[in-house]
Structures are given as C-alpha cells and as structure tokens.
Amino acid sequence: MLAKRIIPCLDCDLQVPNGRVVKGVEFKQIRYAGDPVELATRYYEDGADEIVFLDITASHERRETMTHVIEATTENVFVPICVGGGIRKPEDYFKMLKAGADKCSTNTAAIKNPELINEASDLVGSQACVVAIDAKRRYIENPRESDERFIIEVDDGYCWYECSIYGGREFTGIDAVKWAMECQDRGAGEILLTSMDRDGTKMGYDIPLTRTMSENLDIPVIASGGVGEPEHIYEAFTDGKADAALAASIFHFNEYPVPAVKEYLRSRGVPIRL
C-alpha cells in the first residue's frame, strides 16, 4: 500500500511585499498566519510530504501568481511543491515548473476552459496537473429529483455538491463529483478537494464527499477543509479513502506539529513516512 501524504497548505495573500500566509473560516474571516517562505521551510524540516501554495486572490484579481515566492522557497525546500491560483494557460504551468514547482493546480481556469486540462497534461504530464475543486453542499428533499446531479446521503439528509470559482466568490451550477470525473478523463493527475462547508471549522473533513470522490476516481484525491485534530486526518484516510490530507490551521498555529500527526497516524496503523 502506498504511503499516505501529509500536506500543509499555505493560503497566500500577495497584496503585501513578499506575501503573507492567511487562514479563514468557510473562505471568510481571514487572519494572518505567517511568512510563506519561512512556514514552508519549517514544514519541510518537520517532515511534510508535500507543500501546497494557493494564491487566494490571483484568480479573483485576474493576475499571475507567485513566481518569486516559489523561487525563494525552493532554495531550501526539497519536497514536492504544488502551486495554485492564477494558472490560466498551458504556458503558466511551464513557468511555475521552471520556477521550481513540481505541480500546478487550477480551479477557475479549468472550469472556464476545460480544454486547459488536456493541453496542460499534454505539455507537462498528468503528474503535474492538479485540479482543485471547492465544493459546497446543496441539500435536496427528494434524492430522485434529479438525474443530472450526483446525490450523496449525509448525516442530515441528501445533497449534491456545487463547484465554486474565484476563491468561493461565485458558484457555477456544476456538480463536483461529475466534474472531477471529467477532469480525470481529460488528463488531470490529482484532485485537490476542498469542502467549503468545513473549511477552517475544525469539525473534520467532509467524509461523505471525500469517500464518494475517492470511490469514483482512479487518480489520487487530496482531502481538504475542516481538520482540527489528528483523528480527523485518520478518518480522511480510513473512512474517506483519501490518498493525502491537506491541513492549514493545525499546523500554522502550532496546535499539532507535523511530526506529532505522523506519529499518531503510524500508531493507528496508517502507512506514513516518518
């Protein structure tokens, strides 16, 4: 069995010189968490398996993303780095990989132009093409009311999950599970799946969503949104069947350092690199 991955996520606001890492709740209530290069270096030294940088305002502001931050980070960080935000065309993938990133993540641009996934995977390979999906629950009364939605049973009823774009500012009407399956068919190598309902809440990942994605895809699924303690990551791997777990708050604010999380998972029988 492949080892599960622990991935700290750095949500970056580049409206200040050199950028800053921030964290919100349900994509709102933003607070400052630290310097991106310093945090990435700390997580690398702590044993993170990968690091994700998300430029949270690049797509909304229609600008390019953080090449200078990635260049500075890769001078001292030697684990895979994934960059998202402001990736709009195949050349952007090439530019970020040249700056030192190993993967690029797209959300808004891929939904606006699905052919981007095909073009990027042809240019840099599927392993470098991650599609980020920010999904929000949409409850329904009758699970049979729509053949166009992938209906999922959750604790308090039935719902489908709608994709959002522009950092959660706009909704698309697109079913998240069906969109992920299309992304896989187009050449995406991985899905970064964020529950908007759980983001920053520390209530745990959205397990029904994560499990449904994992069971319907052949490519890896990264669970994101809601982790508050190591038990939540364990649940993402066991109940949610995720291949990797992304977290922010518990690492940024020193609630649970990466080594402690990994040791906990190892003690519970999860295959993990220490």
Curated annotation (Swiss-Prot):
Pfam families: His_biosynth
Transmembrane segments: none
GO CC term, one of those recorded: cytoplasm
Keywords: Amino-acid biosynthesis, Cytoplasm, Histidine biosynthesis, Lyase
Primary location group: cytoplasm
GO BP: L-histidine biosynthetic process
Protein localization: Cytoplasm
Subunit structure: Heterodimer of HisH and HisF.
NCBIfam families: hisF (TIGR00735)
Family affiliation: Belongs to the HisA/HisF family.
Record's protein name: Imidazole glycerol phosphate synthase subunit HisF
